[in-house]
Swiss-Prot record:
Heptamer of 7 subunits arranged in a ring. Interacts with the chaperonin GroEL. Keywords: Chaperone, Cytoplasm, Stress response. SMART domains: Cpn10. It is found in: Cytoplasm. PROSITE patterns: CHAPERONINS_CPN10. The gene is groES. This is Co-chaperonin GroES. InterPro entries: Chaperonin_GroES, Chaperonin_GroES_sf, Chaprnonin_Cpn10_CS, GroES-like_sf. One of its GO terms (cellular component) is cytoplasm. One of its GO terms (biological process) is chaperone cofactor-dependent protein refolding. Coiled coil: none annotated. It comes from Coxiella burnetii (strain RSA 493 / Nine Mile phase I). Belongs to the GroES chaperonin family.
Amino acid sequence: MKIRPLHDRVVVRRLEEERTSAGGIVIPDSAAEKPSRGEVISVGPGKPLDNGEVRSLDVKVGDQILFGKYAGTEVKLAGDEYIVMREDDIMGVIEK
């Protein structure tokens, strides 16, 4: 099953953060914050503009992104967790 986002929305899968601090201390699940990094799984066709045109999105499938702590809406599909968010909620693309 797939999610096909509409307009300027993107579907993101969270990427797990390191569970060890820089000093080598293991961080338990209860103390760890939800990661704010993710991989774009699916993108909508683009943002509708006032003049009727559609502006394509700046992100594409496979991009690794940074997003805010409260960005988007969490959804579960076939046992997997995703976040559906607007492109405006994305802070940046991580370039490799």
